[in-house]
Amino acid sequence: MPRMFGTDGVRGVANTEDLSPELAFALGRAAATLARERSGGRVVGVIGRDTRRSGPMLAAALSAGICSAGGDVVDLGVITTPGVAYVTTHLKADFGVMISASHNPAPDNGIKFFSGDGYKLPDEVEDQLEALVKARPDTMPRPTGAELGSIRQSPEAVEAYVEHLVSTGSPLSGLRVVVDCGHGAAYRLSPEVLRRLGAEVIALNTAPDGLNINAGCGSTHPEALQEAVRAHGADAGIAHDGDADRCIAVDERGELVDGDQIMAICALDLKARGQLPNDTLVTTVMSNMGLEMLMRRHGIRLVRTKVGDRYVLEEMLKGGHGLGGEQSGHVIFGALSTTGDGILTAVQLLSIVAREKQPLSTLAGRMQRLPQWLENVRVGRKEGWEQNQAIQAAIARAEAEMAGQGRVLVRASGTEPLIRVMLEGTDMAHIQRLAASIAEVIRTELQ
């Protein structure tokens, strides 16, 4: 049987077998049971969610499960994923849970756990949760009376998170910023944080109805943000995904500034101020070679990991590095957060713009990107693609044709039925043609 936990928690279409209220209840019971076994006493779990219609349903089921196993719940309501991580540590809770499917469409949802120190759970702890959920008969405790858990709200904990974000930034007075919240978890928090720092904020897509999260807006659909930045004569634009654990930016000309460029700007700034531990940036195999070349010129070592912010974070913790992230806009500031935080990233980026007194386009222009092309191939099954001889032959042909003037990266998505084909080289038309040829073989072999 496939593992219940994927690369970013449990995901599925809400109210189906993959992500039912019954499963949420069982996961809540398992989390509280495991936490009680470790602490030997009363435990507290923090729960947050994004703006999907299924969020309150799953939060109620999860809360019921935690309480039924003798755990107390702090329900934060709508908050960002990094907000849950921060509040978990701020309240010294035993664990945190975020209900979100990030950039996925509204019918999807997910359940992601954090340990008491604010980090995502390691695989072995997720496996323990899964074993408890699947165990028959259910041997988890069922306390009664005063031993049952309770549920409370904590707006003051959410305010503590907002104050933390504000405390990390420089004054932004004089900056005009457009923020696309994608009708997601950041719809109140992101504009509020930037306004408290003094920015003039024009907020887009801040009216969630449970169904419009990520719908033609947010970080995966930046076109309206680009247009708004130009129309308002703004200094920058910021776009979040559904749970705001990442952001992308738009410069004053309406041009996209992706995660690679954001990391480049932040790494150079931190190094100049003597605050880049080990003079190292951690990123993934997807990051553009232009980032690596720029870092090398400035004496910054670039370390690559597998795709996924959890792998970036693992490498950061292992090596004692302070900055890492992904091209998609997940950026982790190790001294300020335990996970990628889109609002925090926006604050750091805009603070550099304010301090440097230079346009964002100038700062982003320090990195010259090599042409890069990504094909997402929807497949009937992902399993076994690495052993498929026809697919491997197609990859080998493309690599031979590039003759060392670029690279080919093919990988399976951890959360969707997709095989991702990424090529990087010196000529866009050439790499597009090669990517299409690999994609066609994948479609044929894995339909």
Curated annotation (Swiss-Prot):
Q: Where in the sequence is the active site? A: S102
The reply to whether Transport figures as a keyword in the UniProt entry is: no
What's the protein called, per UniProt? Answer: Phosphoglucosamine mutase
Give the sites modified to Phosphoserine: S102
Task: List the catalytic activities from the record.
Answer: alpha-D-glucosamine 1-phosphate = D-glucosamine 6-phosphate
* Processing and modification events after translation: Activated by phosphorylation.
Q: So what does this one do? A: Catalyzes the conversion of glucosamine-6-phosphate to glucosamine-1-phosphate.
- Gene Ontology biological process terms, A to Z: carbohydrate metabolic process; peptidoglycan biosynthetic process; UDP-N-acetylglucosamine biosynthetic process
For this protein, the Enzyme Commission number is 5.4.2.10
Cofactor(s) needed: Mg(2+)
The record's keywords, sorted A to Z, are: Isomerase, Magnesium, Metal-binding, Phosphoprotein
- Record-listed Mg(2+) binding positions: S102, D241, D243, D245
Q: Name one Pfam family in it.
A: PGM_PMM_III
Q: Which GO terms describe its cellular component?
A: cytosol
**Family per UniProt?**
Belongs to the phosphohexose mutase family.
Please give the Gene Ontology molecular function terms for this protein. magnesium ion binding; phosphoglucosamine mutase activity; phosphomannomutase activity
- The answer, when asked if Ribosomal protein is one of the entry's keywords, is no
Q: Which NCBIfam families match?
A: glmM, PRK10887.1
Organism of origin is Symbiobacterium thermophilum (strain DSM 24528 / JCM 14929 / IAM 14863 / T)
Cofactor binding description: Binds 1 Mg(2+) ion per subunit.
PROSITE patterns from the entry? PGM_PMM (PS00710)
